[in-house]
Structure formats: structure tokens, C-alpha cells
């Protein structure tokens, strides 16, 4: 029987991004890819990202997070999910532990992130520094300037999309800037083709962005390992960084996604801050039947 059977979880969302939070602190239990896929497939626990909270690894941090996509793969970062974990660790009766000034330091395989409460339902996450070198993103070929890389969709002489920016926020992103509504593009068809393009050795999140004002952006995202999503916090961060590097905006913007709005600031110290809402939908426990045939 899976060791996840009968364990409690929280069902949450941040700007429409469906999040499941699972607390495994105090145990040696680890989620397998097959278990993550089973959780994602169940109507009661369906998620865009599964945020699994483990005991801290690095002294001075509050917890270690493992982040799973719906296909069972792991991600190094999830901004919306991190806000939800922040809420759970500060407010959920079964998970909360004292934190100074409503602030937490969390660790993922990509590094440290700081979470701070702004209001009852709003949190800011310090997503750290963007990675802009081709080998840090990573890309399969050396590009001296990742503000635009050579990649296009459609005919050579009349491409549908071309020359995306490439940025890593702990996970790789390609952002296509366009001059019409991102909703007018068939991202559900384009996204999976580009996600697995050979230029991205670790696959990539694919975004289509329209700069609608000096500090406003409209964004659609195909999320690596998850598909079309209502919101992606790291994509919003990567898009603001990319747009700022291209001098389309300043260093801060409100990013409108189908599920809601996120406020992003790329500070002078190179750290990217993301502020947005969290919502608790409910809680549940995993049925043993959910993991039938899976060894935990």
C-alpha cells in the first residue's frame, strides 16, 4: 500500500493555479512520479502543481519543498504554489508553526525562496535572481544574447511566432512577445511542440505575452509538465524580466493571466518579487484506492 494513503492534503489555488499542499514533515516518505500522476488524475485532488513539504535541509530555513507537475516530473520553482505553502505554514491549524513577522524561508532543489504575508490572503515571494546565461537556463546551443533566441513557429518567411526571450526562474521559460491578444494564438497546439523542442534540453515553459502598457502585460502560459494553465507565477516573473531587458517596460508590472493578476518587481539587487493572492478551497485525505497497484 502507498504510504500516502489516508494522508491529509489541502486544496488551494493562487490566481487560478490549482495547488495541492501535502505535509510530509517528520516522515521519510517521498512521493513517487506514479503517485503524483494518480493524485493529479483524481477529481478530488486534481492539481497543476503538487507542493510537498518536507523537513528543512539547510539550517535557518523553515521547510524543504518538492514540486511535482501533473505528469509526475519535478520542477525547481512554482511561485503560486509557494504562496500557498506560505499560507499553509502560517495559518493552517495542522501545519502552522511560529514564524517571525509572518515570514518564512523555504528551500527547493533550485535554491531558497522567501515568503512574506502582505494581507490575510496576499503573499509576496522573493523568487531570487533570474538566470540569463544560455547554459544556466539551459539551452542546447550557445546564445550570447538570450533576450532573443532563434526559434520560430510557422513558415520561415511568415512565422506565427518567432524570436522568444529565454529566462530561468529556477525552471526554463521561453516568452514570445506579440502585438495582438495572446488568446488569439492556439497555445494548446503550439505549447507542447515547443516545450519539447531540442533547443530546451530540460523542456521549457512556453508563454505568449502582449505588453499592453508601460506597466501592464497580458500573458498566456503552456506550463512544462502540466499544459495550459490559468496562471504561472514563474512565467509572470520571467516575462517581466524579459520585457524589462528589451526595454518594453520598466522593472515592475502587473501581469494579467486568465486566473487573475500578479504584481512582479525586478529589484535593483536583481531579485524578483511576486505578489499575489491565495485561496483555500478545502481539505481531504487520499483514498487508499487512489494508489491501487502503486508501491509506495
From Swiss-Prot:
Residues reported in the UniProt entry to bind substrate: 17, 49, 69, 79-80, 171, 205, 223-224, 233-234
Pfam families cross-referenced by the UniProt entry: DAP_epimerase
Residues with site note (Could be important to modulate the pK values of the two catalytic cysteine residues): 173, 223
Any Gene Ontology biological process: lysine biosynthetic process via diaminopimelate
Catalytic activity: (2S,6S)-2,6-diaminopimelate = meso-2,6-diaminopimelate
Family membership: Belongs to the diaminopimelate epimerase family.
Protein name per the record: Diaminopimelate epimerase
Phylogenetic lineage: Bacteria, Pseudomonadati, Pseudomonadota, Alphaproteobacteria, Hyphomicrobiales
Protein encoded by which gene: dapF
Amino acid at each position: 500500500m502507498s504510504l500516502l494513503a489516508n494522508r491529509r492534503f489541502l486544496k488551494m489555488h493562487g490566481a487560478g493555479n490549482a495547488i495541492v499542499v501535502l505535509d510530509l514533515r517528520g516522515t521519510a516518505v517521498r512521493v513517487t512520479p506514479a503517485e503524483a500522476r494518480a493524485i493529479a488524475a483524481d477529481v478530488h485532488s486534481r492539481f497543476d502543481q503538487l507542493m510537498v513539504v518536507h523537513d528543512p535541509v539547510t539550517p535557518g530555513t523553515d521547510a524543504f519543498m518538492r514540486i511535482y507537475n501533473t505528469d509526475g516530473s519535478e520542477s525547481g520553482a512554482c511561485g503560486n504554489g509557494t504562496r500557498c505553502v506560505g499560507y499553509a505554514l502560517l495559518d493552517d491549524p495542522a501545519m502552522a508553526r511560529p514564524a517571525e513577522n509572518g515570514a518564512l524561508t523555504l528551500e527547493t532543489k533550485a535554491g531558497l525562496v522567501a515568503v512574506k504575508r502582505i494581507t490575510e490572503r496576499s503573499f509576496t515571494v522573493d523568487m531570487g535572481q533570474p538566470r540569463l546565461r544560455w547554459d544556466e537556463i539551459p539551452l542546447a546551443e550557445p546564445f550570447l544574447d538570450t533576450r532573443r533566441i532563434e526559434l520560430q513557429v510557422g513558415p520561415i518567411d511568415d512565422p506565427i511566432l518567432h524570436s522568444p526571450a529565454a529566462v530561468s526562474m529556477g525552471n526554463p521559460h521561453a516568452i514570445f512577445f506579440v502585438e495582438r491578444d495572446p488568446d488569439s494564438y492556439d497555445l494548446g497546439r503550439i505549447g507542447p511542440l515547443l516545450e519539447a523542442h531540442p533547443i530546451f534540453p530540460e523542456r521549457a515553459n512556453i508563454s505568449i505575452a502582449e505588453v499592453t502598457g508601460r506597466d501592464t502585460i497580458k500573458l498566456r502560459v503552456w506550463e512544462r509538465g502540466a499544459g495550459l494553465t490559468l496562471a504561472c507565477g514563474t512565467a509572470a516573473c520571467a516575462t517581466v524580466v524579459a520585457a524589462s531587458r528589451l526595454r518594453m517596460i520598466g522593472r515592475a508590472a502587473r501581469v494579467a493571466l486568465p486566473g487573475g493578476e500578479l504584481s512582479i518587481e525586478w529589484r535593483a539587487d536583481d531579485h524578483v518579487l511576486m505578489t499575489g493572492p491565495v485561496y483555500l478551497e478545502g481539505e481531504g485525505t487520499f483514498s487508499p484506492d487512489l494508489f491501487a497497484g502503486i508501491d509506495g
